[in-house]
Amino acid sequence: MKQPSKLIAGLVAVCAAVWIIAAIHPLDRQAWVLENILLVVFAGGLALTYRRLQFSNTSSVSLAAFVILHTIGAHYTYEKMPLGIWARDFFHLSRNHYDRFAHGAFGFLLVFPIRELLLRFSGIRRGAWSFALPVAIVLAVSGCFEIIESIVAEIVAPGKGVQWLGGQGDEWDAQNDMVSALVGSLLMMGVVAMLKCTEARPHLHPLPLSPAGRDARASGSEGRGVGLGEASAERNKFPHSNARDIGKHFLPIAVACYVAFWIALAIHPLDRSDWLLENLLIFISVIVLAFSYRKFRFSNLSYALIVVFLAFHTIGAHYTYAKVPAGFWMQDWLHLNRNHYDRVIHFSFGFLLLYPMRELLVRSVHAGKQWGTWLAVAALAALSSFFEIIEAVVAQIVRPDLGAAYLGTQGDIWDAQKDMGAAFAGAVTSALAIVLLKRASAEAVG
């Protein structure tokens, strides 16, 4: 059995010592326990997977640094961390920003180990996607952490909401935390890109591609063709996606139907300004799909799923999400406390777009099919988190006087967390469906 290096042993000893000292008389024992639950799970996971993962020295130092920062924050509670209070007074800030610093450190310090794991195990290759996917995973995890925080807050201190979490009066606390993690991860990936770590500093990735990574790359390399001719052959490898079965004119017909539907709902929307803002997503999506069509063509099934989601979103934009008739019908029939059409759309975002995202990652990024499925979940969770950030920015620009109320939260202080949770649940449901269908198909063939 390979023994841990002196560096690893030293890092473990330092982290353990800091944790033990911080565990003595924390400022708030209940908050300390809650803050340390995820830390203990995280440390346990690293310990159990050490022999398999064996991070590089750079990644190990990054992980240890984050553990120490979080341990100190948990001891004082993030809201009352002395260093943050000093910075608040010295720079004349509106609040203690140690929590923002910790979220930024989360992105900055953990994105490198995540990238290392992806390069070694997932089959993806060095390049733009090897930088984008780790950032997406960081943002997805940050969003999931905000979801978990909201659940814990409602269980431990129902009714106190973000005040119990140390939001310090910031109604955009969750979005600002996610921005901090995103900026931190982008900074680290920018540093890695500038230093060209993959070529100029090979010692940062001392281990060769793992057997699992070679298998993943082999399974993902089936989808290398991205040109029109190669894409046609590749689409045959995805179930129910052969254009000849559905009709070679499927895409033009689907586009024509959607355009007609969009034009009909563009006439006299309930709120024209809200309609314009909601349609920015549609405009951006259509432009991206149009310009990338010749380089990467999705299967007909993927295009169908994309069109269905855009149609659902178009309905929400016409009525504004808080006033969609179907949502009122669900509210009355199921005796709900609000119009939940927005939750349906967020769930649909994850459920319907999981397959297209998986197809993109497997065929274009060369991720293994299993890795592609779960990386697609992370990518969609990241997009959902990013959308909540964009919404917050737009609300503060367009109607700063209304704040979160402008977004149609309908009085729900956890609206952002529930939207992200719905998208994540939809993506996981779709991923499980794909895994089960593939397993059933394999058993039937066998």
Stretches found by the model and what they are:
Residues 28-32, 80-84, 98, 142-143, ...:
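Interfacial helix-loop-helix junctions of multi-pass membrane proteins
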